[in-house]
């Protein structure tokens, strides 16, 4: 996680009583936490070195409605889509807010015949909490 104000963000988390520690993606501790966490939730992609262990549960929520060009439809898309596709394929669950988003992501990242996890049709956490 690239933190703009890590001290301020950590102070806020501590002030509301959450037992959460922010770890910068550039810190070696991030690698350890990523490798040893039981639950992984991401709305983007983990670094290219990430491989989910069998005992980990990975929920991929992506980060928006795909109204722009993605994956193989991008210029140089086939060459540049590796890490995103890699992350989707390691997820146990991929959450989509609607059928349009599911269709675009599954097609643009060539997941239709490759993805063996569970597709969850549900609102996004940041929107559906309200």
Regions found by a protein language model. Give the residues of each.
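Active-site and donor-binding regions of nucleotide-sugar-utilizing enzymes
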Residues: 1-130
């Amino acid at each position: 996680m690239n933190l703009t104000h890590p001290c301020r963000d950590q102070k806020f988390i501590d002030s509301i009583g959450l037992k959460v520690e922010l770890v910068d993606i550039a810190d070696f501790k991030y690698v350890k936490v990523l490798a040893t966490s039981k639950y992984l939730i991401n709305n983007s992609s983990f670094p290219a070195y990430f491989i989910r262990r069998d005992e980990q549960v990975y929920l991929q929520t992506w980060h928006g409605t795909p109204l722009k060009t993605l994956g193989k439809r991008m210029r140089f898309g086939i060459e540049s889509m590796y890490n995103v596709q890699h992350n989707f394929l390691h997820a146990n669950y991929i959450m989509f807010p609607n059928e349009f988003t599911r269709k675009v992501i599954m097609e643009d990242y060539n997941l239709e015949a490759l993805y063996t996890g569970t597709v969850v049709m549900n609102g996004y956490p940041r929107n559906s909490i309200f």
